[in-house]
Amino acid sequence: MAQEERSIIVSVIIPHHNNKQILVDCLDSLHQSTYKNFEIIVVDNASSDNSINDVRSNYPDITIIQSLKNLGYAGGCNLGAIDAKGEYLFFLNN
C-alpha cells in the first residue's frame, strides 16, 4: 500500500545542518524500521555542504524543507511541524 493511501500516524521531523553522514545513517535506520506508518521530514538549516541535494537524490520519499538561514534545532522543529501530516510528531536531533 502506498504511503499516500494510508493514514500517516507519525511524522518524524529531523532538523539538519551539514554532516551528511549522520543524516544518512539516521535515514537508513528509519527505513529499516518494521513500523512503516510514518513520514520523514528533513528541515535543512542552511547547510553549506550540499548534503541536502544528495539526500534529495537518494531518498525521494522524504519531504525536504530548506531554510535560507539556520533556525537552530527548535526553529527547525517548528518549521517541520507546519508541514507534518501525522497525528503524532517525533523529533530527532541528528
Where are these regions (language model features)?
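Active-site acidic Asp-centered loop
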Residues: 45, 92-94
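N-proximal low-complexity "stem/linker" segments adjacent to membrane-targeting elements
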Residues: 1-32
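Short loop->beta transition adjacent to catalytic acidic/histidine clusters or analogous donor-positioning motifs
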Residues: 8-10, 31-42, 62-63
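Acidic helix N-cap motif at the loop->helix transition within catalytic regions
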Residues: 24, 49-57
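Short aromatic/hydrophobic "clamp" motif used to bind/position activated sugar donors
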Residues: 89
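A conserved acidic beta->alpha catalytic loop
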Residues: 29, 44-52, 69
